[in-house]
Amino acid sequence: MQGYLAEKASQGVAYDLRNALFEKIERLGFGYYDRQETGQLVTRLTSDVEQIRTFAGSGVVQLASAAIMLLGTTVLLLFLDLQLALVALATVPAIFVLLLRFVQRIGPLFRGVQQALGRLNTVLQEDLSGVKTIRAYAREDYETDRYREVNDDLLGRNLETVRTFANNFPFVFFVANLGTLGIVLFGGLRVIGGTLTVGELIAFNTYLGFLLFPILTIGFLSAAFSRAGASAARVFEILDAPIEVEDKPDAVALPPVRCRVEFDGVRFRYPGDEREVLKGVSFCVEPGQTAAILGTTGSGKSTLVNLLPRFYDVTGGAVRLDGHDVRDVTLSSLRSQVGIVLQETLLFSGTVRDNIAYGRPDATLDEVEAAARAARADEFVQGLPEGYGTVVGERGIGLSGGQRQRIAIARALLVDPRLLILDDSTSAVDAETEAAIQESLDRLMREEHRTVFVIAQRVSTVRDADLILVLDEGEIAARGTHEELVRTSELYNEILGSQLEPAPAGG
């Protein structure tokens, strides 16, 4: 019964820790994920929590039992013979000093083991996610060597902890046996002197074993405690991590917006980076307008739109929707009015319908199909074996890149956003499909008077936008319509010219 209750309690601790960790991870800002490896987070949620659970269960019970046994045996030995008891107990402080030094040495080693395990999980996660790329470039041997390298590091760290055990515990046993030797010598002299009988000496020596057993048990448990402590420190690094983007104490709900978007002197740098990605960006997009963002790689296009749903907070200036600073409203009320299709399309394991309805789980099948038609996804979905009930694999395996993008667009449209953000979301579809999607989006957005932000690499995608912003090194280098920029912007014409196909050679 004692074991059952201890295990039940430890499982409860692990359950609560996993829930607390997951809830915290869900609330942490994107800046935190930019600095962390996925494998390390997975290891903290699994292996580190399990180390804590193991000690919280059997370890705590054994520690309590050993402490009670140590206290009881000490009292008994003092009662039997005060002089012999003092001789026996003389080694106890030395043993605990050795154990304390052991804990101080082994703790950082266990932390290193967990860090190495996290790196191993990171390599594994990257390998599984990029298996097609690895095969395409015939890099299997390289990845195998990379995995073996981190696995060797993990093995080395584990062996180092084993060596620390082997180098420290013989001294603990030696000091413990010194106590036994002292009892035999001092007790033998008293037997010779007639102040102690042989039977009393044997009995005392027997009880001495009950003193050494809990001390050695505590010694072995100190290793489990050190490992649990190292894991707990890693777990609490997440639990104590500051949330970079969260609701202000006096945040208010954002009312339904017409979605006039204003950037007012916006400056931004990523946490830990001194380089400014956006430098004093200012512009205004009226309700129902389509704004297109163009620029070279690294010019700050994705960063700019990431500030709209407040994935990051500006480091200077302000972003406003209908005059409301996005930092002054609740995140839920803000993001519920924003639909976003990211450049990296993610689908979850489940049916096509579940993926489209991810933002609105209560949506009817008719609503799901309407969103799919608007995204030009309905035709290929109907051709799947089970239609909208077809189960797609993890990350949308089984669908082409263009099909995944169209499902992601349908998912964004279904939430009925006042502001739609398309981050290069049609890069994987052909020109004909892109034109059809754009036509549907234009009709939907203008009928409902919605505001759209489009990031695209192709000028053909954005030439009909009401406002085109050309970014260069975090600043707006040019702005206007397509016709205006063709007349006035050298950079825009360079981008346009780079996308024109050279005329075929005559012959």
Set out the residue ranges of the language-model regions.
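Transmembrane helices of ABC transporter permease
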Residues: 58-112, 185-196
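Short active-site loops of ABC-family nucleotide-binding domains
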Residues: 11, 31, 39, 43, ...
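An intracellular "coupling" helix at the cytosolic face of ABC transporter transmembrane type-1 domains
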Residues: 30-31, 47-56, 60, 64, ...
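ABC-type nucleotide-binding domain
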Residues: 247, 254-507
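Transmembrane-helix motif of ABC transporter permease domains
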Residues: 1-15, 23, 27, 34, ...
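Hydrophobic alpha-helical segments in the permease module
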Residues: 92-100, 165-179, 198-223
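Helix-loop junctions and hydrophobic alpha-helical segments within the transmembrane domains
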Residues: 21, 25, 134, 235, ...
